[in-house]
Amino acid sequence: MARFVLWGTYCSDALEKRTPYREEHLSRLKSLKQDGILITLGPTEGSTHVFGIFEAETLSVVQQLVAEDVYWREGIWTAINVYPWIQAF
């Protein structure tokens, strides 16, 4: 399995706008974490950006996971980039 880094941005007023979708989002993340796919994910201080690390077979798998997330579908995340990552330490 390869590791991938996710970096993205939140919409303005994300803390308020995410409220109706937060439970679905967190439930899905918990499932991905239990399955060993999600290593970590969370906002930067101020909730302007999101950072995550995933473990998956391919880049396209992670991109599909992002596309299926309610935060992406509802515009809470406004831009997401996923990069293959080589963990040195």
Regions found by a protein language model. Name each.
Residues 1-89:
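Conserved, structured core segments of small domains
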